[in-house]
Amino acid sequence: MKKRILAFTLVLAMTLFCFAGCGKKQEAVKDTPDKTMTDVTLNEVAHSIFYAPMYVAIEEGYFAEEGINLTLVTGFGADKTMTAVLTNEADIGFMGSEASIYTYLGGTEDYVVNFAQLTQRAGNFLVAREPIDNFSWDMLKNCTVLGGRAGGMPEMVFEYILRKNGIDPMADLDIDQSIDFGSTAAAFSGGQGDFTVEFEPHATALEQKGDGYVVASLGEDSGYVPYTAFSAKKSYIEAHPDVVQAFTNALQKGMDYVQSHTPEEIADVIQSQFEETDKETITTIVTRYYDQTSWKDNLIFEEDAFTLLQNILEESGELSQRVPYADLVNTEYAQNAAK
């Protein structure tokens, strides 16, 4: 735990200038009446189809309808997204909620508070070198798996699934954590590992190239977990409650859209967010997430979900003590948006 807190401290000291030039102004698709607009910078942990409801809200003009002029920045990691929020490079962060726990336990006075939960399942997949019709998790024993960063949600959920299936992550297999996030698919194509844990679009890309085959969904096998949420510094929420409410309202409209439209329709809306990916591939990926109920129908971060998150952190050896739900989660804005 001390190492995890130290990691965030070092990031604060070393990465203050990582975010310049990375922002993209998100233009409203719909015409909106003249109104006073508020600039909001949102730093997302990654740019992924997994977060489709947020991109629907952008592309359908829901943020503009709520009076928000949104700039979206990709942080490429929860540590960097958290740093952007804590150093006022971003107003709102979108990342795994474990980051809020780490900073809280690290003694940050103006800590971040989660106010809206977007995803309720893990968004990554286990990829094998050959198709496996009747996959079982014990097939990973004595194998090498390309995994994720220690202390991050992808890796902790993977280890959580292993333990649920009677597998010791430390003793029964070799989890290679030496490869940077985003580079594991290329390493797997190059011959490293027997399996790899991949987000989209990398999982589908491996299949399309014939280099790998999805054999399991971590989202399905883990059950419901509070995977990603929106958060802001306590002081920002206190100073700008109307902005936080408007932001959450826009997100809820995006959630409503994905609940009432087909994967094909969702793919049509978000395609401009992923210009390097063809429409058919986007539809395939959206369908995967859609079929496993990745997205909640509301944004309320329930207490039992937060308890499960702390259970996962504790089992992974990343939590030295429990933190209060009431301190790190505010459901007021999500509840209002869901009405």
Please place each PLM-identified region on the residue numbering.
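Short, glycine-/small- and polar/acidic-enriched structural segments
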Residues: 29-170, 174-178, 187, 194-201, ...
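Soluble non-cytosolic domains of exported or imported proteins
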Residues: 48, 75-79, 94, 152-153, ...
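Pocket-lining segment of extracytoplasmic ligand-binding domains
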Residues: 180-274
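Secondary-structure end/capping motifs
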Residues: 238-320
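Conserved C-terminal helix/tail region of periplasmic/extracytoplasmic solute-binding proteins
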Residues: 307-339
